[in-house]
């Protein structure tokens, strides 16, 4: 099983996908990596172990989704998260739980959640 730090990084990947569905270009990203981590920390236990989803996890997922208002925000978050998960091993079960977070939290994203996401393609 992956460590809590590794799972947090995997959960952060979900944030990228949550952020990609909100529109409008802007010159500078306003969402920090710290905000991403803070919003997704409540999701670690669920991604690590499954079971019941903590309501504060969904609050964080929805909050992060609402923070990503611009293309620059979404690309910046994507790059931050890709760096965080780079080289971190995880199981298919963990990846599946992380990928399912947006839907379980009522956030509809039209993108595949994957470490191979091309951040430059995010609009």
Swiss-Prot record:
Keywords: Disulfide bond, Lipid-binding, Signal, Transport. Disulfide bonds join 33-80, 43-57, 58-105, 78-119. Residues 1-25 form the signal peptide. GO terms for molecular function: lipid binding. GO terms for biological process: lipid transport. Coiled coil: none annotated. Pfam families: Tryp_alpha_amyl. Belongs to the plant LTP family. Plant non-specific lipid-transfer proteins transfer phospholipids as well as galactolipids across membranes. May play a role in wax or cutin deposition in the cell walls of expanding epidermal cells and certain secretory tissues. This is Non-specific lipid-transfer protein 3. The lineage of its organism: Eukaryota, Viridiplantae, Streptophyta, Embryophyta, Tracheophyta.
């Amino acid at each position: 099983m992956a460590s809590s730090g590794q799972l947090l990084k995997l959960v952060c990947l979900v944030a990228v996908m949550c952020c990609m569905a909100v529109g409008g270009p802007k010159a500078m990203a306003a969402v920090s990596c710290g905000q991403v981590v803070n919003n997704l920390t409540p999701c670690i236990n669920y991604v690590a172990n499954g079971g019941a989803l903590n309501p504060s996890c969904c609050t964080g997922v929805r909050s992060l989704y609402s923070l990503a208002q611009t293309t620059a925000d979404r690309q910046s978050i994507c790059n931050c998260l890709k760096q965080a998960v780079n080289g971190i091993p995880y199981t298919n079960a963990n990846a599946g739980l992380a990928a399912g977070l947006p839907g379980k939290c009522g956030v509809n994203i039209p993108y595949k959640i994957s470490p191979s996401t091309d951040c430059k393609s995010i609009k």
